[in-house]
């Protein structure tokens, strides 16, 4: 848990419960990561780059569909899900706020995870280290510090910071993916 001006037991409990609920919602999309990794690895070895593109785009499509549906459950069911784990009104209220923000970035999480699987499948896993360092350390520290301490948004700054870091990570990684795939002679996001 990132140090914020609000490190009360309420915020820690809320985040602990909410992150587990978020992970449950993300579970259906996890299988697509492994599918993309397997398909990419096989087709990369067989030098069938068009099939890599096709598999990647299909996994992205279904990942987005799954997570848009999951986001709707997360956003509108946040209160119900929090009440399953606690009766404390303060914890529920804080958790609802986080889950509703998490619902805004949940649809893009499979994009990052499936893209990471794609890069691993084409034997370029080093880029996943860079994006993970940005997402979990450098970008998170800078953005969350700015929001929580400099702009004084406190706990709300942490939640919004997580949203911003996730979106930036996906945007940066999609540029990396597109660039690296072009170096292999494969244009993932080509125009028709």
Place the predicted regions along the sequence by residue:
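Helix-terminus/linker motif at the lipid-water interface of multi-pass membrane proteins
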Residues: 1-18, 24, 42, 80-89, ...
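Membrane-helix interface segments
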Residues: 8-11, 125-126, 154-155
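Small-residue-rich hydrophobic transmembrane alpha-helices
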Residues: 14-78, 109-131
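Alpha-helical membrane-interface segments at transmembrane helix boundaries
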Residues: 16, 22, 92-100, 135
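Short runs within selected transmembrane alpha-helices of multi-pass transporters and secretion channels
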Residues: 29-37, 102-121, 127-139, 143, ...
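Short alpha-helical transmembrane segments in multi-pass integral membrane proteins
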Residues: 40-105, 148-192
